[in-house]
């Protein structure tokens, strides 16, 4: 949607209260199909989110998503391989949920589900995935290459059964599920994460509670979005700011540690995805390790 169309759709007299923001998702759309889809570039992903946030806040709210039933798993799509870990998944979730707008969490996202491993096209159910396979083959890709494309981009990745425990079929059913269960269910499931205080699931609970807390719900709901450190490679950072509070959300998507100069002193560290270690903060300096995210209140 073009920026000048936003008032018509989500303004005070617009058609809708909100619309989903797919600006980052379209970055991996291919010109002719999935087979020529470009790899995600962090700088373009960051720029797309920032642009959407700055344009939308003039008129209303968009609904922010990492994934849904029509998209592959966000952890596999938006994170480089080295960041597809519990810490990296928590980092991605923090950035998404604390943007200005209405946050959505899709089933399985809160435990860090990633794309499944598909061994043949017969395992897919989605008709569009099968169409994309044939498009890739007609473009000259081998059977294995076309399968890899579909494995990466298919929405069936988000439609595998919810992983409740490490029992057969992930505890979802004793019958035959419509799709095979993601093989990760033995390591990634609700039951195990319920018992781990540092799990992705329990982190998401902290994150949601923080956004809804009496102290911060106003600034996270109505506060202005202001990007920061855009000149730093691998850093996604922004302020949520109103008349009474200035919150900095800073995430390091890069492989190497990064140091940022803060504009003011730190009043409080509200959240970090490194539970075993406090965020490395000095009076006016923030040091972030790879895949680390912090939520700070500044003076």
Cite the ranges covered by each PLM segment.
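Active-site and adjacent substrate-binding regions of carbohydrate-active enzymes
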Residues: 1-299
């Amino acid at each position: 949607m073009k920026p000048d169309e936003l008032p018509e759709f989500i303004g005070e007299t617009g058609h809708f209260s909100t619309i989903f923001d797919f600006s980052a998702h379209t970055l991996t759309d291919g010109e002719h199909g999935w087979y020529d889809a470009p790899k995600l570039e962090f700088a373009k992903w960051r720029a797309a989110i920032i642009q959407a946030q700055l344009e939308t806040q003039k008129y209303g709210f968009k609904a922010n998503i990492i994934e849904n039933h029509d998209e592959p798993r966000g952890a596999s799509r938006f994170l480089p391989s080295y960041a597809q870990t519990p810490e990296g998944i928590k980092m991605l979730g923090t950035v998404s949920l604390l943007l200005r707008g209405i946050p959505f969490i899709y089933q399985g996202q809160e435990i860090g589900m990633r794309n499944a491993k598909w061994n043949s096209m017969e395992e897919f159910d989605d008709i569009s995935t099968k169409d994309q396979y044939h498009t890739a083959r007609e473009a000259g890709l081998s059977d294995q290459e076309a399968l890899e494309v579909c494995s990466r981009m298919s929405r069936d990745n988000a439609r595998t059964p919810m992983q409740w425990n490490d029992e057969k079929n992930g505890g979802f059913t004793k019958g035959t599920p419509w799709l095979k269960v993601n093989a990760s269910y033995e390591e990634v499931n609700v039951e195990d994460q319920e018992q781990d205080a540092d799990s992705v699931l329990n982190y998401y609970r902290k994150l949601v509670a923080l956004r809804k807390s009496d102290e911060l719900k106003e600034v996270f709901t109505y506060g202005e979005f202001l990007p920061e450190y855009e000149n730093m490679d691998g850093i996604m950072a922004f302020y949520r700011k109103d008349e009474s509070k200035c919150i900095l959300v800073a995430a390091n998507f890069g492989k190497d540690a990064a140091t940022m100069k803060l504009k003011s002193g730190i009043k409080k560290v509200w959240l970090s995805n490194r539970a075993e270690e406090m965020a490395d903060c000095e009076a006016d300096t923030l040091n972030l390790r790879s895949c680390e995210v912090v939520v700070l209140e500044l003076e």
